Amino acid sequence: MSDERGYSSADLPLYYEWHGKSAGSQPPLLRVHGGGSTIETNWGLLIPALEESRRLLAVELQGHGRTGTGAGPASFEGSAAGLAALLAELGVGPVDVLGFSNGGQVGLQLAARHPAAVRRLIAASAPFRREGMVDGFWAGLAAATLTDMPRPYFDADVAVSGDPAHAERMFHLDRELMLTGFTDFPDSLIASIAAPTLVVAADRDVVRTEHAVRLASLIENARLLIVPGSHGDYLGELFAAAGDSGPLERTVPFLTAFLDD
């Protein structure tokens, strides 16, 4: 249960929640979910693992969970700008950032375009070029329809938004974001990231291992962590972890060691 929640005052108000305890001089950890997700589906297992030692801020991006769908398409740059504005409005920053999948792409944009907002970045399973996805990913996404959306994600969104049409719009927003909205992030943009960065991927991820290596090589102050597992199970993500907290428990010490360094 969050101890504080609200919406930003932007044209598209972003829903946010606070969890956990202040940890001395440590900044809050902003968590940015992946596609098709809510706070609960992406971070339901991670929050209890961290809330005793750190102040946690979670948001829901355009069209996800309690945040409205908006009138236009989603973009990684736009989401990063919305997060920077939210942090300024809350009077916090620089913060540590953990972004998963699409949220990792937003985190990269946030660190590059709004460097004053980010102290440390964890970019988890985050592609920065289209070629970074495994074989078959793009063809599968292009052919996908709403019926291909895993039912737990659909139901989880409806549970908090109260509207099946919201979950349907979320599916189309995320699909179009990747198919048409995602253009390769320039190497120069990635190389401009000054925040210490931990690049994380799983050995059976949808992001190629060599792509994660390339991402880490472009950021001057970056480390690389390849963990056993699949896309998101190592963060306790609902569909990937399927209730098994083991991969998360094995990964958390690496994340906290990086954040506390």
Task: Give residue ranges: language-model regions.
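Conserved HGGG/HGGXW glycine-rich cap/lid loop of the alpha/beta-hydrolase fold
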Residues: D11-G68
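Conserved alpha/beta-hydrolase "nucleophile elbow" surrounding the catalytic nucleophile
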Residues: H33, V95, G99-G104
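Active-site loop/oxyanion-hole signature of alpha/beta-hydrolase fold enzymes
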Residues: G44, P48, L57-L98, A241-E249
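Flexible "cap/lid" loop of the alpha/beta hydrolase fold
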Residues: Q105-R113, R119-Y153
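Active-site nucleophile elbow and catalytic-triad environment of alpha/beta-hydrolase enzymes
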Residues: L173-L189
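Short beta-strand/loop motif that positions the catalytic acidic residue
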Residues: I193, V199-A201
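Conserved alpha/beta-hydrolase "acid-adjacent" motif
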Residues: V206-H211
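Catalytic active-site module of serine/aspartate enzymes centered on a nucleophile-bearing elbow/loop
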Residues: P228-D261
